[in-house]
Amino acid sequence: MVRFNCFITEQDGQGDHVTQIKRFNINRFRFRRYFRVFNHRFNGFSRFRFCLGDFTLFLGNNRCWLVIGFSVCFDNRRRLNDYFRLNDN
């Protein structure tokens, strides 16, 4: 199982405020399917960093942390997608 913790924040004149928190568990197969949809949906609008068990998405003023059980760093989507293809078994 993979644990996801998603914190979406918005900026106002007084700083960041958490507006939504999502936590859910999915297995590896469902994670792979979700990641493809997630990556496509935000294609061109996001910068992914995959480091020390944290998958971080920056989209405008919103920040979403998806915490999963990996400890390898990736700085772009293509390398991350290659990693999942290589570990498809």
UniProtKB/Swiss-Prot annotation:
It comes from the Viruses. This is Putative protein p54. It comes from Acyrthosiphon pisum secondary endosymbiont phage 1. The gene is 54.
